Curated annotation (Swiss-Prot):
It comes from Odontomachus monticola. GO terms for biological process: defense response to bacterium; defense response to fungus; killing of cells of another organism. This is U-poneritoxin(01)-Om4a. Keywords: Antibiotic, Antimicrobial, Cytolysis, Disulfide bond, Fungicide, Hemolysis, Secreted, Signal. Residues 26-39 form a propeptide. It is found in: Secreted. Homo- or heterodimer with PLP7 (AC A0A348G6I9); disulfide-linked. The keyword Electron transport does not apply. Belongs to the formicidae venom precursor-01 superfamily. Truncated sequences of this peptide have also been found in the venom. It is possible they have been cleaved in the venom. One of its GO terms (cellular component) is extracellular region. Expressed by the venom gland. This homodimer composed of two cationic amphipathic alpha-helical peptides has antimicrobial activities against E.coli (MIC=3.1 uM), S.aureus (MIC=3.1 uM), and S.cerevisiae (MIC=3.1 uM). It also shows histamine-releasing activity (66.4% at 10 uM) and a weak hemolytic activity (10.5% at 50 uM). Residues 1-25 form the signal peptide.
Length: 68
């Protein structure tokens, strides 16, 4: 049984839509990553992580979890 040309055309259009959607999603992810980098999120996270590392042992020591 041979598929009709309408079926083949539908499959081609469907596959093109899937490929376009995947390329568009990748481009949006790249744009989001670039926007976060420009906003300095990495530096902000580094500062926050430094504060956590600085104050967490002291807080755990006060709660009795870590011997100082």
């Amino acid at each position: 049984m041979k598929p009709s040309s309408l079926t083949l055309a539908f499959l081609v259009v469907f596959m093109m839509a899937i490929m376009y959607n995947s390329v568009q999603a990748e481009a949006l992810a790249d744009a989001d990553a670039e926007a976060f980098a420009e906003a300095g999120v990495k530096e902000l996270f580094g500062k926050a992580w430094g504060l956590v590392k600085k104050h967490l042992p002291k807080a755990c020591g006060l709660l009795g979890y870590v011997k100082q």
